[in-house]
């Protein structure tokens, strides 16, 4: 396409001196950087982003109601945002996942990790021959038809299921959507394979897209710590860590979650892998309350896995989240036998690794115990982090030895 025949997009003009992040190829433009919009753009529509002198910087999606006013699709002026664009992005992403799936023997993985795969606001997880789609931003929703068409071109044998039923869409005035897009309806529970485990995934009703693929490598790493140990698995969801602990030879694993449905699937996962169900206990309870009750009754564990949901959605909640992480990790440290292992995680993007490490150190001081950091975790390799978007590193964790 020549420049003379190129679509004419509305122009988002930045204030003087506010182009630096785009020159470093960061994919967001915040409201404070915007001078004006030239032309009319509907919610999610494609716009050109220029500096205060009109110099072209990037092409992105317009989000007038969001603090992130524009999310960048491309830094290449020659790229039009159309089906061919999405097809190219999908094929780029698929190359890495194909290699990874072959090396690690995976049938399920994250195909698109938003900004880090050049598709801001788009999450796509593959479970067997099902593609589960989440559109989290106005731009992603605006391009829904083009994206689905590109998916059908790249993966014609896959069924597509929409799980855009996430509250963040409401912030931009978008309805929550869920249901089949193309192909067959996923079964109530779909079996997948991960590092020798068989696991049941609830695509239609489970958390997020149905399963936390980002913790795959951490679940495998758990096995080295658990042989002949008593394990407490907090916020267990459907028991991925529990199954891995049993495969690692633990003496007992106690899984705690507030959802009975999740615990029922966890039990089925233990049975599916033909593991000793007598070594697995499933407790429906609030983790904070249960840890305090365990402390009062003198319960002790050798390994504790702490994988809570996101405690912080925005900067105003960060201090409260820090207190929550500190409290729950202090309780865990107090419940560990000397020499015990704490595997603790945060999936809050605003929580940096350095801050999380400091919180664990403060929790250890409050618990009156010494703690050694012995291993560090992050999201699995199918959840890449592009160098210019450090916010993409949202999952962090530590293995700690408690003295």
From Swiss-Prot:
Keywords recorded for this protein, A-Z: Cytoplasm, Methyltransferase, RNA-binding, rRNA processing, S-adenosyl-L-methionine, Transferase
Main localization category: cytoplasm
GO molecular function, one term: rRNA (cytosine) methyltransferase activity
SUPFAM superfamilies in the cross-refs: PUA domain-like, S-adenosyl-L-methionine-dependent methyltransferases
Keyword Methyltransferase: yes
CDD domains recorded: AdoMet_MTases, PUA_RlmI, RlmI_M_like
Pfam family membership, one: Methyltrans_SAM
InterPro entries attached to this UniProt entry: PUA, PUA-like_sf, PUA_sf, RLMI, RlmI-like_PUA, SAM-dep_methyl-trfase, SAM-dependent_MTases_sf
Domain of life: Bacteria
Enzyme class, UniProt record, top EC level: transferase
Localization terms from the record: Cytoplasm
Entry GO terms, CC: cytoplasm
Its EC number(s): 2.1.1.191
Catalytic reaction(s) noted: cytidine(1962) in 23S rRNA + S-adenosyl-L-methionine = 5-methylcytidine(1962) in 23S rRNA + S-adenosyl-L-homocysteine + H(+)
Keyword RNA-binding attached: yes
Domain PUA: 9-86
Reported function: Specifically methylates the cytosine at position 1962 (m5C1962) of 23S rRNA.
Protein family (similarity comment): Belongs to the methyltransferase superfamily. RlmI family.
Protein name: Ribosomal RNA large subunit methyltransferase I
Source organism: Salmonella gallinarum (strain 287/91 / NCTC 13346)
Gene: rlmI
């Amino acid at each position: 396409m020549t420049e003379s025949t190129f679509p004419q997009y509305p122009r988002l003009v930045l204030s003087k001196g506010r182009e630096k992040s785009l020159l470093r190829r960061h994919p967001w433009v915040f409201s404070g950087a915007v001078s004006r919009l030239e032309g009319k753009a509907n919610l999610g529509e494609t716009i050109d982003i220029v500096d205060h002198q009109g110099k072209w910087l990037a092409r992105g999606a317009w989000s007038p109601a969001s603090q992130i006013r524009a999310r960048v699709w491309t830094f290449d002026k020659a790229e039009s945002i159309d089906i061919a664009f999405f097809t190219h992005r999908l094929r780029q992403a698929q190359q890495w996942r194909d290699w990874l799936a072959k090396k690690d023997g995976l049938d399920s993985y994250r195909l698109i990790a938003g900004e880090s795969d050049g598709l801001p606001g788009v999450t796509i997880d593959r479970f067997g021959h099902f593609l589960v789609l989440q559109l989290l931003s106005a731009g992603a929703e605006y391009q829904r038809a083009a994206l689905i068409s590109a998916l059908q071109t790249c993966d014609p044998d896959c069924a597509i299921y929409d799980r855009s039923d996430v509250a963040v869409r409401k912030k931009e005035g978008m309805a929550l959507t869920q249901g089949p897009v193309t192909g067959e309806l996923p079964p109530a529970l779909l079996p997948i394979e991960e590092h020798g485990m068989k696991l049941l995934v609830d695509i239609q009703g489970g958390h997020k897209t149905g399963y936390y693929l980002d913790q795959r490598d951490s679940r495998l790493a758990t096995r080295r710590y658990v042989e002949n140990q008593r394990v407490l698995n907090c916020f267990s969801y459907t028991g991925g860590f529990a199954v891995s602990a049993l495969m690692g030879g633990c003496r007992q694993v106690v899984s705690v979650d507030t959802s009975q449905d999740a615990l029922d699937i966890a039990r089925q996962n233990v049975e599916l892998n033909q593991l000793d169900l007598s070594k697995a206990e499933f407790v429906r309870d609030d983790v904070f309350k249960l840890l305090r009750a365990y402390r009062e009754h003198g319960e002790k564990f050798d390994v504790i896995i702490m994988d809570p949901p996101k405690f912080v959605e925005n900067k105003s909640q960060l201090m409260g989240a820090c207190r929550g992480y500190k409290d729950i990790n202090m309780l865990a440290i107090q419940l560990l036998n000397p020499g015990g292992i704490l595997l603790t995680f945060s999936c809050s993007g605003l929580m940096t690794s350095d801050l999380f490490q400091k919180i664990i150190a403060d929790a250890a001081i409050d618990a009156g115990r010494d703690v050694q950091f012995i291993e560090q975790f992050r999201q699995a390799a199918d959840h890449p982090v592009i160098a210019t978007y450090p916010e993409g590193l949202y999952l962090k964790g530590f293995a700690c030895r408690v003295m």
